[in-house]
Amino acid sequence: MEWFESQGGGIYFPIGHSPHSDFIAEFGDRLARVQVKTCIAFRHQRWQVTICTRGGNQSWSGLVKHFDPARCDYMFVVVGDGRRWCIPSAAISGGRGIALGGPKYSEFEVEPGRPLPDPHGEEPASTIDLPNARGDVRVAKGTRL
């Protein structure tokens, strides 16, 4: 969203259930439905972005919803190192996934942003020092709960 605002766009959020777009960007008299994807999977020198949906936060029924370019106008992708792409939906080939970082979608790469947090990274230990630790679970388990 920050990138769209930096380009002069207004940002609007759909109210209620909106399975096909995450937000609406307004540029003058034009509205664009935007779907956002994040990716930390880096294999074979490319970011392997999954663009299909496999249930989300609901219990998975086994049905895969493939990407359909008619459902949104742009796909905005942020990858682990902060690189970003704003890809017109019509330019996306494939319904399950795309590989970014090579020549195919390079014309749609925009300015990088902040890197994504490392989901496997170690958090620093707590520096909380309680004077009366009796009965505190940290006495047995340490500072990492």
Question: Each predicted region: which residue ranges?
Answer:
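Phosphate-handling catalytic interfaces
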Residues: 95-133
